[in-house]
């Protein structure tokens, strides 16, 4: 565990340096006098854009080298620091004394440490001044951030493998950057890959450790971005603490939501970029709200809100297109009631320019790469899937179509019965009435006209809207939250809507103009994202996979439900007791935490897609540390390739199985490590964690009882057993090795073949093969061979 804690600290340091410290030093003049919110938004977006542009720019001219990246980033940092006259004079004075022989090396180090200490003290004092009068607020926010990071990183300390299959793909793309190849698998937003690559180059942190921990650490950026947005749009600046506390403690009751929230544990592009959508909305709102006549920055041709909107938009594009789409809908929800302000001359033109600038900044490297012959990455075909109405891997379009067809068949059946019944009645009437043909023709014409009028009537349109609302409720609210919770959400939605309308009326009566109302914006956003989730069931294209919307929708729903409490906070702040508002927010956060425990709705532990035992990870680490670089080969399933790729070689167990049946088969490294699962693991099982009840509870497995997923929890792992009876059994052929291992029968056969091959090798060379590690689930054999006389590994 000590190793993983140290790796977590290294990743944390590298992340803070790259995301915040480096841009804070480089742009200290730009940031001087700015608020903490501005500093956060600036650093967290500009750093991403600079890293992405630098790495991809060098890659486009085939100059992407680790040493060059280090020279650029450290060089810019040193030059920026030395621009300070005091620091420059101190630096040159120290080194002049060192080279003159009047200053020893130890003294130089102590003096440099002293100067660094002075800088830290100065920074702390500056921070103290910035947070004056708000220390309790920031303390509560810090506790919430620490709790969030602890909750989402808990799994990485329990299971040291990647938690999601996509992470192996992203690792491969990052390794492509290490080899100097950008867009190694096709044109795709690479900002996250570039960021991890720079952490690896600048600090020597293994890519494996970066991907294992950075996503959980980056949750802090999401929490702060949500904090900044709702602190701005709510009438009370303390309501946002209730929103964050509810998001971090209240449980969920649907597998889509569990999946959506679990994704925050993984270092993958969409979740890495989620914070940018909230920053886009924040600075669009701030830009629309501003008063240009009193804005001093207008004279300079600069608007800080528009600048940060541009950088946030650009950052969302370079990280993941889904995030940009979500940012669009989030911004549209808030901007709807400020539409007249947007189309003002002083707003519309700058906004259009900002959007174009954001698009150009972010897409230029991708466009240039595509223009020079690099194809698009396969996952970008989602656009064509939307146009064609076909499913993505996570899509529900086909499911929705099947349900729609079933409903149509039921309706048609009912309609046929109704027609048959009406026909029987008409027959009886015709038997008892004698009518002329003229009357029949007239009656038919009247009926046709009535049918046409009914079809195009307002009543029909209203009925269509009502039907769609019912579908959104059924396949959105009720599906995600169950009937009881969905009922409460609808009540809060109506209440928030009423409060928003009331605010509009009061403001209009007082000032004779319509305000840019935020309560309605929050409510519209929560409803719009629910419509996006239920889109395929409404006959609309599924622009974003529903499960990926759940996390943002969860935050928006809590924000909407906090609107009535925001009104109460606002009224409380107008009284003489307003000075107790920070303590009231602290009490609210504590009450939510205690209440979720008391009412049994405290959130549960999340899951990883388990692909290997922890002992396998630890053994691989041991091999990496103790064996010479590239002088060993690990023969195992695919996962070890990514952990050891920077220092060793890897042979797929499936390839070993096939090649060992050839006439001759050698592996040209000094050390061979054979990994054998004595109990073959059920590949990609949903492994739920267990742990202390103050952090979370074990409660989510019950929601998977009707799914096909293989589940495990805590110390229990779903696995099988190797056997001699499985030798020479046929293996199911698959497209690639990793797919073969997901079939438990294949895995049993391959692990059995490997185990008994090692036993056979031991019979022939008893002193050459040794057990490197063994427990009840896993065994690792090692063979040391003479590279001049390699062993023939064929049967």
Residue ranges, per PLM feature:
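Membrane-embedded, hydrophobic transmembrane alpha-helices
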Residues: 1-131
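Alpha-helical transmembrane segments at the extracellular/periplasmic loop-to-helix junctions
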Residues: 5-22, 220, 271-278, 446-509, ...
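Membrane-helix boundary/interfacial segments in multi-pass membrane proteins
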Residues: 60-66, 157-167, 179-182, 203-204, ...
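Membrane-interface helix-loop-helix junctions at transmembrane boundaries of multi-pass membrane enzymes
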Residues: 128-135, 237-239, 294-303, 342-352, ...
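Active-site lumenal/periplasmic loops and adjacent helix-entry segments of GT-C-fold
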Residues: 130-276, 296, 552, 609
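Extracytoplasmic
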Residues: 174-175, 585-667
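Perimembrane helix-loop-helix junctions
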Residues: 326-359
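Signature aromatic-anchored transmembrane alpha helix within multi-pass, membrane-resident enzymes
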Residues: 352-362, 566-600
